[in-house]
């Protein structure tokens, strides 16, 4: 346990540019892990690669483009958090437990909610443009 605390203390002592560079490196490692291990993350990235330029093209101004982009980015964020929850639960134990199921189900529900939000925003926007 002392090793973990020493490592944590060493990381907490970093400040300024060193801390920022370390945080960036950890974030990039997180993206890499999600890309390699999570099919859902890759699917949402593909959706974002298509949807973000489409949002810029469809939006009549900056605000409309952002309105369409936010749900796409939200889905990416929620998938990263959902994957993190799943990994932590699996790290603790691979055995079935009602609390583990609850945590994973809640993460899944968060992603489902983000995807519903995406569908409502894009669907409403596109229908509004069709009937305008």
Model-found features: residue ranges?
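Short basic (Lys/Arg) and small-residue
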Residues: 103
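Hydrophobic alpha-helical transmembrane segments
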Residues: 2-84, 92, 96-98, 108-132
